[in-house]
Amino acid sequence: MRPLTIIGPTGTGKSDSAIEIADRLSSKIAVEIVNADAYQLYRGMDIGTGKVPLAQRRGIPHHQLDVLDVTETATVAGYQRSAAADIEAIASRGALPLLVGGSMLYVQSLLDDWAFPAKDPAIRARWERRLAQVGPARLHADLVRRDPAAAAVIPLNDARRTVRALEVVEITGRPYAASAPRIGSPRWDSAIIGLDCETKVLDERLAARTKAMFDRGLIEEVISLLPCGLARGVTASRALGYAQVMEALKAGADTQALDRARQQTCLATRRYVRRQRSWFRRDRRVRWLDATVSTAAHRTAIIEAVLGAWRRAS
C-alpha cells in the first residue's frame, strides 16, 4: 500500500487532518498513523507537543508515540529505522501508512532513505573535549578552516552539529556536504501533501495554541517530568515550551517569569515555523494546500483534496 505523507509547519492542522482522513477511509481501508514529530516520541510530553489525546484518536492505531523516556536521546537514525519498520509492517497488513509530522530531518530521512555516515566514538570524544575547552565559537572556527561550506550552513551556536560535521570530515576525508543525501523519488513512492497558511493567520494560531497549552497545564506537566529526568534529557529538555518553563521554574516561577516563558515559547515557535517552511518548500515533490481558512466546509475541502491527490498518485 502506497503511503501518504502530510507535512507542514506547526499549527496548520496536520494531526487533525490525518485523523479525519483515516476516519473517512475506515469503511474502505484500514489506516494507521505514523508520527514524525521528534518530541511526541517522549512519554509524558503530551500538552506541550500537541499530542492528540488517546480519547480523540477514534480508535486509529498510532505509531512512534510514547516510545522514549525523557532521559533517552532521540536520533534521526534511530527514528528512521523504527518508523520504516512500522510503515512496512502496516503496508504488509494491507493498511494505509499515514505519515504525519513537521520534524524536518525525521521526515526527509525516512522518505529519502538516508544513509548515515559512520561514527567514531573516539574522534567524537576528542572534538567534544575540544568544545569543552574552547567553546562553540572557537570550535566553529575549526570547522570554517576544515570545511567552509559546512560552517556556512551550521549556526555558530549549534555545537552538536559542529561536532558531528568535524567528526564526519575526519572520518571520511571529504566535506560534510558530500555525505548529505539528495532529494529524489520518495521512498515507497509516497504521496506528499503539505499544509500551510498565511503568516498572519498562522501567527495568531500559534499565539492561541501557546496560551491553550499553558491553560491546559503545561507548567504542571513539566513539573511532573522533572523527577523523571527531563532536565537531564539531551533531546527532551530542548523541546519548545518545556525549556522555557524550566527556565521560569529556576527563576522562581513567579507570575512575571511564567508570563515571560509563555511569550518566549510563542516567539520560539514562530521562529521554528520559519525554519520548517524554508526546509519543506525546497522539496518540489510536495503538493501544497492552503489551510488558512478553518471553517468546517474548508476543512472538508482540504480532506477531499488530500484524498484526491493520494488516489491520483496511487
UniProtKB/Swiss-Prot annotation:
Substrate binds at T10, G11, T12, G13, K14, S15. Belongs to the IPP transferase family. Disulfide bonds: none annotated. It catalyses: adenosine(37) in tRNA + dimethylallyl diphosphate = N(6)-dimethylallyladenosine(37) in tRNA + diphosphate. GO terms for molecular function: ATP binding; tRNA dimethylallyltransferase activity. Keywords: ATP-binding, Magnesium, Nucleotide-binding, Transferase, tRNA processing. Monomer. Its EC number is 2.5.1.75. Its cofactor is Mg(2+). The record marks S103, R124 as: Interaction with substrate tRNA. Pfam families: IPPT (PF01715). Catalyzes the transfer of a dimethylallyl group onto the adenine at position 37 in tRNAs that read codons beginning with uridine, leading to the formation of N6-(dimethylallyl)adenosine (i(6)A). This is tRNA dimethylallyltransferase 2. One of its GO terms (biological process) is tRNA modification. ATP binds at G8, P9, T10, G11, T12, G13, K14, S15.
